[in-house]
């Protein structure tokens, strides 16, 4: 999905910042695992709550967990098990950009999500 036709980075960024929520879904796509790529004939799908993902980049690389929240306003996802420990001992969820994760298991409760796939 194209938000703008411009090549200029400043206009690309502006289009992302000002995009309506219903168009942000396509930007929130993550790579699929090899098994899911073969099954659905797609390289990536938008991340949804309930999907299981594996973190590929950053301090939490290698952690696998279920997506508990998708923040379309901030282009971030919250994954169970990816937490930041604060000085007082409390743990807070650490938001991750969907481009830094790989979907390993899909939440298949929504039939409309797969209506255009080959299966």
Swiss-Prot record:
GO biological process: translation
Gene3D superfamilies, sorted: 2.30.30.30
A molecular function (GO) term: structural constituent of ribosome
GO cellular component, one term: large ribosomal subunit
Keyword rRNA processing included in the entry's annotation: no
Keywords for the protein's UniProt record, in alphabetical order: Ribonucleoprotein, Ribosomal protein, RNA-binding, rRNA-binding
PANTHER family the UniProt entry points to: 60S RIBOSOMAL PROTEIN L26 FAMILY MEMBER
NCBIfam families listed in its UniProt record: rplX_A_E (TIGR01080)
Biological function: One of two assembly initiator proteins, it binds directly to the 5'-end of the 23S rRNA, where it nucleates assembly of the 50S subunit.
Family: Belongs to the universal ribosomal protein uL24 family.
Record's subunit section: Part of the 50S ribosomal subunit.
Record protein name field: Large ribosomal subunit protein uL24
Organism: Methanococcus maripaludis (strain C5 / ATCC BAA-1333)
